[in-house]
Amino acid sequence: MSGFSTEERAAPFSLEYRVFLKNEKGQYISPFHDIPIYADKDVFHMVVEVPRWSNAKMEIATKDPLNPIKQDVKKGKLRYVANLFPYKGYIWNYGAIPQTWEDPGHNDKHTGCCGDNDPIDVCEIGSKVCARGEIIGVKVLGILAMIDEGETDWKVIAINVDDPDAANYNDINDVKRLKPGYLEATVDWFRRYKVPDGKPENEFAFNAEFKDKDFAIDIIKSTHDHWKALVTKKTNGKGISCMNTTVSESPFKCDPDAARAIVDALPPPCESACTVPTDVDKWFHHQKN
């Protein structure tokens, strides 16, 4: 979407790497708190964290001031999603809807599990491979209820409103009809993607069936309500940084100079990326249960 830009700090694929978001005035903002949930009527904003086909597990840093995008770290090592045959990296553009929060203190009535303490996730199924940190408008089509290590982790299915075929997609049944096998592959991917790391398969509510657009929008709205409580300090933030520059009713709102000071304290941008381990391209073969 026009008006937003990114600024990288440090080298990609390094522990210090960060992607900050800026508004149309060039001021630093939080992609979690400052980008509006809606881009237009019935259109949601999406923050792209991971471009399709890539492996680096990039995500909004919810506990860091201004919530830049950074690569996830496990036991001191940068995380890369394995290529679980026949897939290569992420099979959609993957990211989050801003101004949403899956509250870890809220037991979801549909799943019986509490939220995962993150913005709600989005799988964008359009034809364009988006860029890390890109802000796009998406049309919501449906949702999948994943249970990740006992936590509710909703996966919204959506399409970029600028996709040439966006007009043909209005609900989850259109995905089933026009992209046969894609939803089944999505369930399979989420079920097994942690297996190469020695983790068990993930589980799902609703017998791994996708719920429709209206159901998905209701879930998104509920996570938006949880976010409102978070950013206005009406609920326990569980270590999340709510620093923002635009939410007038938030006690965490700061001025542009304070936001700039956060970024200026970090390493400068680096033109060359660090070397990605060669085993990131390895295929993993795993028998489905």
UniProtKB/Swiss-Prot annotation:
Gene Ontology biological process terms in this record: phosphate-containing compound metabolic process
InterPro entries, A to Z: Pyrophosphatase, Pyrophosphatase_sf
GO molecular function: inorganic diphosphate phosphatase activity; magnesium ion binding
Chain positions with N-acetylserine modification: 2
Domain of life: Eukaryota
Catalytic activity: diphosphate + H2O = 2 phosphate + H(+)
EC number(s) reported in the record: 3.6.1.1
Chain positions with N6-acetyllysine modification: 57, 228
Alphabetized UniProt keyword annotations: Acetylation, Cytoplasm, Hydrolase, Magnesium, Metal-binding, Phosphoprotein
UniProt entry tagged with the keyword Coiled coil: no
Main location: cytoplasm
Cofactor(s) in the UniProt record: Mg(2+)
Residues engaged in binding Mg(2+) 1: 116, 121, 153
Modified residues (Phosphoserine): 250
A Pfam family that the UniProt record links to this protein: Pyrophosphatase
GO CC list: cytoplasm
Localization terms from the record: Cytoplasm
Binding residues annotated for Mg(2+) 2, in chain numbering: 121
Keyword Hydrolase: yes
Family: Belongs to the PPase family.
Quaternary data: Homodimer.
Protein name: Inorganic pyrophosphatase
